[in-house]
Amino acid sequence: MKFVIAPDSFKESLTALEVATAIETGFKRVFPDADYVKLPMADGGEGTVQSLVDATQGKLIECEVTAPLGDKVKSFFGLSGDGKTAIIEMAAASGLHLVPPEKRNPLLTTSYGTGELIKLALDLGVESFILGIGGSATNDGGVGMLQALGMQCLDSQDKPIGFGGAELANIVKIDVQQLDPRLQQVHIEVACDVNNPLCGECGASAIFGPQKGATPEMVKQLDAALSHFAEIAERDCGKQIRDQAGAGAAGGMGGGLLLLPSVQLKAGIQIVLDRLHLIDYVKDADVVITGEGRIDAQSIMGKTPIGVARTAKQFNKPVIAIAGCLREDYDVVFDHGIDAVFPIIHQLGDLSDILKQGEQNLISTAQNVARVLAFKFH
């Protein structure tokens, strides 16, 4: 008997590794002699660093970088077990949660700290990057990040522009001569699950600006600034980023990253599936178990359980999902490779208590799932 356990984290309760371990514990009460493969998963969003560090026996690197409003903030990134890959979450340096609601203003916020994380990882000699760009506070086209890496965005006085989305309107020249040369030797995979272009009614400013504090007038100003940046970038860097799918992700960070030498925008879950070689483990599995904190109709939009299920179904393997909770529309996942879904909440209660009981409830639910499977396998 072989079980592959490949869940995402249960947010605010358990990491993906803790979820996988709890499921294994429950199953071992019924199948003590089975073979178990635990693969902590993620979809490129929050928790991706921790999951990939755990899955590769890597480590977290703590550091201090520039926060969205220019002050300093404690941050981190992950290093894979072999030391060759850095895993970075943009939100750890340039995240919306780092800016108090009353101070959120994408005219002013910068992605400079994300560039500093990349540079710190380069100092460790990494060969590749996985970069998650969700949850950002910025709308600066990734220019702050590029500045931290040595790219010069100069104004009419031949001086570097300042921080923030508004400053992009002042760019008259982009000089790549001082861009960190080590970037020529590394490949960057960007976890990007949106297809928005850089500018226009479906662009970064219009779609994502308001949630970062932009008023309707700010949206117009930011969009014009990004459009101007794209024009200068095409002239000075020879790359057309305005209409590229995904360029509008994370306030234009997708577009800014495309100006670097070797960058690929890719679905977050696919990056993780490929890096952890899930397909190699499910080929000879008897059952695949996945899960996440909540399963609903949104789960089919690039979330971990469906990514795992689709991989398993290439080999016609049964897939069971265990979730913290379910919404009424959860059954849509049955059309996307998941065969059964089990919630772990056993009784109503205060949310904080339910979160505290998450591990024990997960073990108990996993044991019950295993007991059902025992009818087939024993």
UniProtKB/Swiss-Prot annotation:
Phylogenetic classification of the source organism: Bacteria, Pseudomonadati, Pseudomonadota, Gammaproteobacteria, Pasteurellales
Domain of life of the organism encoding this protein: Bacteria
Family per similarity comment: Belongs to the glycerate kinase type-1 family.
Coiled-coil annotated residue ranges, if any: none
Entry protein name: Glycerate kinase
Swiss-Prot/TrEMBL GO biological process terms: organic acid phosphorylation
Gene Ontology molecular function, alphabetical: ATP binding; glycerate 2-kinase activity; glycerate kinase activity
EC number: 2.7.1.31
Gene it is expressed from: glxK
Reactions catalysed, as given in the entry: (R)-glycerate + ATP = (2R)-3-phosphoglycerate + ADP + H(+)
Keywords for the protein's UniProt record, in alphabetical order: ATP-binding, Kinase, Nucleotide-binding, Transferase
Top-rank EC class of the record's enzyme: transferase
Presence of keyword Transferase: yes
